Amino acid sequence: MTTHATLLPSCYEESDYSTLNLSLTTDISNCSSFWDTSIKTEKIIAYQDPTYYSLNYRIIGTIFQGVIFLVGVLGNIMVVIVVTKTRSMLTPTNCYLVSLSLADLLVLMASVPNEILSYYLLGDEWIWGRAGCIIFIFLQYLGINASSLSITAFTVERYIAICHPMKAQMVCTVNRAKKIIIGVWVFACLYCSPWLFLTKTVPIYYKGHENMETCTFALSREHYLGYFFADLVIFYIFPLLLSCVLYGLIARILFTNSLGEDYGKRNGVKTSDWKKTNNNSARVQVVKMLAVVVAVFATLWMPYRVLLVYNSLAKERYMELWFLMFCKTMIFINSAINPILYNAMSVKFRRAFKKALSCGRTRQETGLVPFRSVAITTRENVAQKTTEA
């Protein structure tokens, strides 16, 4: 589940496992012969001709990924602000969405600027040193894995809230959600901690340039296969399978309730409590939005996942530059699109975004309250909060 977008030279792309770190337009055979002479013999240094991305590649990559970065950063920051500053928005589900936004922010901040910068550097040049190599790799993995865990967490929370409403009054609370989110990030940090030791910087040699280095894997490709496939299963396949099962069960409950209401209306039975219908409608809206988030996650990560599996099994790896840019861009879109989905599919988020963006209004008019008062809630509205987004 890797997307450290600009960190590995193309010679390591060919010999190592990751496929999203291509930052060189030169021929692979030249690269392999270069490393054979400069590293294996340690006596003969073969200097390569300077290589750069094409102008079209730079322009397209900069424009598309730059726009995605700006939209994603601003959108995810808005999600965090409206949930933490608006009393009615502080629900267990929205707490998980805040966690997802923070993870997406981490992915965008640790990946996109370096990706765009790499278009204008020489070859595989890495300018942030060994510490930067370690930190950026770790943060990218941390953000990716935390986002997957956050998606899994809010899926389970919705299942409990809708399919086990009595249990939800005790389980689906804001305080419990905060504890689960802390656990998610602690687990993600521990799982990603090996990357603090699995990367390094090595010197690279170009004619007319000195003291250059690149960021790459510290071990050979074979040592990473198990780790990468564990990522694939734990943070992609398992969350998607679990989501399919749980959303199927949720849909059955909501569909059954909807049929019951239609039957009552056809037979002249009036609903005694109109709030029940309102709550069910709100639940359907929330579930639709979250299901779309999961579907988008699965779709946008699929090109990279397919490429990862193919390149790990095929004798000749597929390393076409434009397709690699496409895979990376899809991952960046995945980290930027969720706030747009919330605005499009959730009336409450749409209203909260408008209020947060409005100018010249008082705190009472916009519905914003100090953060410290957000956590103050009553037991009577816990059950209602579990049905809202």
Which residue stretches match the model-derived regions?
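Seventh transmembrane helix
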Residues: 299-308, 325-373
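Juxtamembrane loop-transmembrane helix junctions in multi-pass integral membrane proteins
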Residues: 49-63, 88-91, 124-131, 138, ...
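First transmembrane helix
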Residues: 57-85
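Helix-to-loop junction signature of class
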Residues: 65-68, 106-123, 137, 144-151, ...
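Extracellular TM2-ECL1-early TM3 structural module of rhodopsin-like
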Residues: 57-66, 92-99, 103-153, 161-164, ...
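Fourth transmembrane helix
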Residues: 143-153, 160, 164-213, 238-255
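Loop architecture of class A 7-transmembrane GPCRs
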Residues: 44-51, 121-137, 142, 170, ...
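Intrinsically disordered regulatory tails of 7TM GPCRs
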Residues: 1-52, 208, 256-287, 347-389
